[in-house]
């Protein structure tokens, strides 16, 4: 069967309206899992937050402005990011995050933001995604097999988690696949640490990195 030429037809005996996306637990899920409707909704909300930050900038010192940022902006982009954080549409969210940090720091529109993220100790969107995925893997590490549990002979990086076999790009981008792939880029010993220590070390490391793209993380020779 040629999947590229296959069309689907939905049959129903009810009068319920068929929609291309629906909202569940605050997350907009579309039928093609592009996450575009959810990201568009986030951007609309964040645009309002930027307006709020600009007004607060006039009356609040920077430390209180950062509190407002974490309460109204950071909390929005962090919600459910493990699901949508690797979407092709996330750049529109990151553009707004860079505008937010320029407002907080009083920087001009042409100011490079990476040093600002590092100085202000604010996780970039990509770093927030990586953090969330690593935290998921720490919580669920017993659920996934490590390579030494599958192969009887020694293999390179035998203590890393085994990736599921998949050929479809959409499958390779799903959140579990990406979580394992991200986890395999940091030393296995990190997952032996107590959770509070793990969270602190991962956070400090990501704050110093300020990745803009997930490819920056994967292309580094040694991430941690």
Task: Show which residues each predicted segment covers.
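Short, conserved micro-motifs composed of acidic
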Residues: 1-22
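Short, charged alpha-helical motifs in flexible N/C-terminal segments and linkers
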Residues: 2, 68, 92-149
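Basic, alpha-helical interaction scaffolds
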Residues: 18-82
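Conserved, non-catalytic sequence blocks in retroelement Pol enzymes and Pol-derived host proteins
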Residues: 33-42, 56-67, 83-94, 119-125, ...
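Extended, well-ordered alpha-helical segments in internal regulatory regions
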Residues: 72-87, 128-141, 181-183
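Charged boundary/loop elements
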Residues: 78-90, 94, 173-224
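Amphipathic alpha-helical
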Residues: 139-178
């Amino acid at each position: 069967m040629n999947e590229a030429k296959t069309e689907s037809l939905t049959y129903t005996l009810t009068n319920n309206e068929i929609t291309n996306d629906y909202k569940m637990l605050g997350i907009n899920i579309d039928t093609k899992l592009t996450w575009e409707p959810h990201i568009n909704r986030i951007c609309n909300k964040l645009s309002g937050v930027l307006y709020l930050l600009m007004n607060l900038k006039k009356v609040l010192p920077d430390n209180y402005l950062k509190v407002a940022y974490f309460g109204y902006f950071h909390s929005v982009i962090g919600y459910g990011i493990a699901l949508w954080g690797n979407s092709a549409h996330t750049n529109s969210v990151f553009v707004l995050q860079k505008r937010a940090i320029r407002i907080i720091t009083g920087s001009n529109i042409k100011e490079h933001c990476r040093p600002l993220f590092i100085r202000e100790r604010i996780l970039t969107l990509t770093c927030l995604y990586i953090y969330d995925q690593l935290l998921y893997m720490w919580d669920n590490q017993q659920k996934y097999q490590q390579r030494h549990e599958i192969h009887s002979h020694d293999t390179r990086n035998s203590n890393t988690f085994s990736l599921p076999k998949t050929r479809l790009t959409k499958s390779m981008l799903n959140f579990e696949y990406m979580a394992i792939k991200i986890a395999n880029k940091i030393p296995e010993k990190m997952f032996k640490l107590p959770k509070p220590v793990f969270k602190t070390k991962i956070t400090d490391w990501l704050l110093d990195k300020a990745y803009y793209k997930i490819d920056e993380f994967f292309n580094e020779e040694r991430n941690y």
